[in-house]
Amino acid sequence: MSSLVDSVAETTGMRAGQAVYYLAFFFFCLNEAVCRTAFDNVLGLDIPTFTSLCNYLVIACFALKILFQRSTFSRGILALFLVALSVVCWRASGNTLVVWTVLFIVFGKDVEIRPLAAIAFVVYSLTVFLAVICCFSGIVEDITYLRGSSVGARSSLGFNHPNSFGKCLLEANLAYLTLRFGKINMYDLIVPLLSIGAMIFLVDTRTSAFALLVAAFLMFILQHSFAKRMGPSISLGISVAIIVASYYFMAAYNPGNTLHATLNEALSNRLYYANYFFTGWPLTLFGYDFADAPLHLRENQAAIHLIVDNTYSFTLVQFGLLTAFLLCVAVVLVFLKAKKEGCFNAALCGLAIMVVLGFSETWSVRFDANYFLVAFSTLLYSTPLSQLDPSATRSNANLSPIIPTTQVRDESLFNRFGPSYGKEIRLGGAWKPRGQFGLRGIGAGRLPAVQHRDVSLGTKSFRR
C-alpha cells in the first residue's frame, strides 16, 4: 500500500512540475514575442515593465519546479554547477541569454516536447495574427526599412523589424510541424509554403524563408521509419560538419578566396563578422561584453557592439571557451545517446534542424525558438530520450511486428492441472490466449503448452 501511495505521489508531483514548467515557458515565449512587435504597451504596461513582470513569473515557476523535481545528489550538484557557470558568463558578457537557456535545461526533467511546441504555436501564431491585424487597422505603426541591396521599402507588418515578422512566422510553423511530426503529409506543407511566400514577397526576409524551407523538408523526410535507424547517425554527422565549418570559417576566412567570398556574400557578411570579432579580441574562458568594440549600425538603425550571426561562433566569443565547449559536447553526446537507444523523435529531429540553422543564425541558443534543447536534460539526469515524446513511443509500439514464438511443454503445469486441460496456454507474445488455467473439456488428454518468445523462428509451431 505504501508503495502505491509513493507511486501516486511521484506521478502527481511530476505532473505538477511539468505544469509549472510549461507555464514558465509560456511567459518566456510571450515576452519574446511581444518584444518583437511594434506595440508600445501591453494591457497598460510599457514594454520594459511587461518584460520584468514576465521574467519574475518565470523565476517564480522555476522556484516551484524545485519542489517537484527529484534527482540524485550528484545530479543536483552538477545542475547547480551549470547554473553558477551561466551566472558567471552572464556577468562577464553582460548577456542574460545563457542564464535563461541553462535554467530551462536544468529544470527540463520529465518535460515533453509536444506541449512546448503547442505553447509556442499558440503564442507565435496569435502574435503574428494580432500584429498584422493591428497594423492594417492603424493601431500600431507599420515601420518600413530599406535594404541596401534591394529596391523599395520593406514593411514590418506591425513588428519592430521585417525579420522579426519572419522569425515569429518561422517559429509558429516549426511548432506546427513538430506537433504533426510522424503524420506530416503534403497538405500539412501548404501553410509552410504560404508562409515562405509571405516572408519573401511581403517583408523580404530571405533567411527565415530559407530556414523554414529547410525545416519543412527535413521534418517531412526524417519522420519516416528509416529515421529511427539512420536519423541519429545522420544528425550526428551533420552536427559535427556544421560545427567544424563554423569554426573553420571563423578562424580562416579569407576574402581573397573565391569560395569564401561567395559564401560570405550569400550569408550577408556573416563570415566576415565572425572572423572580425575572432581575430580582433582574445578568447576568454567565461565570455566578454565587447563594450570596447566599435558600434555597428544595423538595418533597423540599432547600434550594437557585437554582430555575429552564427550560433557556435557567437557562443565562443560572447560566452567564452567553456560554454562553447559544453554546447558542442552536448550536441554530440545527445545524438550518440539517441543512436545507442535507437530513438529518433520530434525533439531530436527539431534539435538537428536547429543545429543546421545555427550556421547562419543565433536561434540555436535561444530557448524560445530552440526548445528542443530540453533534450540536453536527458544527459544531465540520465533519463531516456523516448520520454521527450511518449506519443511517438506509443505509436511505434502499436506498429511493432508480432514476435514469432515457439512452444514447449511445461510439466509443472501438467502435474498441477492434469491432462484434462485443453490446448495451448500462451504466456506473452502478441496473441490472446484461447483459454485460462483450470478450464476443462477442451482437447482432453493433451498436454498444456506454454508459449515462449524465440526471435530466431520465422513461423509458429505448436506442440500438444
Language model feature labels by segment:
Residues 1-10, 14, 376-464:
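A juxtamembrane structural motif centered on a specific transmembrane helix
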Residues 33-51, 296-305:
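Juxtamembrane/transmembrane-helix boundary motifs at the membrane-water interface
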Residues 37-45, 141-151, 261:
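Membrane-interface helix termini and inter-helical loops of multi-pass transporters
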